[in-house]
Every structure is written in C-alpha cells, then in structure tokens.
Amino acid sequence: MRKWMILLAAVLMLLAGCGKEPAVAGLSDEEFHQYFAEDYARPVSNITEITEENGGLMLKTDLGAPITAMKDGTVAWAADIGWNYGYGRLALVQQEDCYLLYAHCSQVAVKTGDTVKQGDKIGEAGDTGHTEDGIRVGVYRFPLEDVALVTGADGTVSAFTVNGEVSGIGME
C-alpha cells in the first residue's frame, strides 16, 4: 500500500507541472519609459519586447490584447480594413504637438474624427499588414499645419502628406 501512495504522490507532482506556462511579466515601467516620455501611458498591458524598426517601435504583445490611447487626442485617420501599405488596420491620433500611429491592429475601435482620452480603447493588437503579433507605434513630430490628409472621392482618408510629400505611412 505504501508503494502505491508514493507512486500516486509522484504522479500527482508530475501532473502539477504540466499546466500552462506562467505569463511573461513584460517590460517594467522604467524599461517602457526609456522609449516614451513619462506622460505617455502604455498602449497595451503586457509588452514583452520593444524593437525599433523604420522610424517606429514594434511592441510585442498578445494577439487580441486591448490597445488604449497613450495620450488624449483626435483620430485623424482610422482604417479598419485593408493592407494599408503594410501597416494593416490602423489609427492615427492627432495630439497637441504630434501624431501617434497605432498600426497592425486586429480590429480598430475608433473612427476618423473621434476624440479619445488617455486609456480609451483604440483597438486590439493583431498581425495585420506586414508584422508579427503586436502593434507598431510611431510618434510623428512635425508642424500640424504642414499635414494634409489625402481623401478619395468618397471622402475616406487613404494617406497623409507633410509639406506635400507623402509621409512614411499610408503610401509607398
């Protein structure tokens, strides 16, 4: 009987270790604020890695994780469909002194013209466009009066220009 009890205890200990791996804790606030000023909130709660690419940052996180506004602003362009020149579904939010780009969303929860407050839902992290799971965040600082949105005949925004030059997003 004692052998069976020891065997049962050993099996139970082995099974206890077969559960799901614990979630990665993610980047600390200190690590996050190496990339963003203190007044910027995290756009997703579980950032596991930040990589710099093409003038923006790729924030690796769980597919479908809620994306929230890093600062207050107005949605200048929201695209919940299409490839959008490799950026996939995206939202471009105008701040007081810059634009914030949230790209590669699995879905976008805002529309062009919406006002967002820091912490409001923008969409969900995805893998649309040319990327892996996560979101791309870009901070574009240029005089806002130099920016023009490019609209089609139906009034939908398809890109933007800075001083007449096509920006890094929206167009090739």
Q: What function would you assign to each model-found segment?
A:
Residues 1-4, 19:
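Positively charged n-region of N-terminal signal peptides that target proteins for export
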Residues 4-11:
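Sec-dependent N-terminal signal peptides
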Residues 19-89, 118, 162, 166-172:
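Surface-exposed, glycine-biased beta-strand/turn segments
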Residues 50, 78-79, 108, 125-128:
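Residue-level recognition of beta-strand microenvironments
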Residues 69-109, 133-136:
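Zn2+-dependent peptidoglycan hydrolase active-site motif and core
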Residues 120, 136-172:
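Acidic, glycine-rich catalytic/binding loops that coordinate metals and/or anionic ligands
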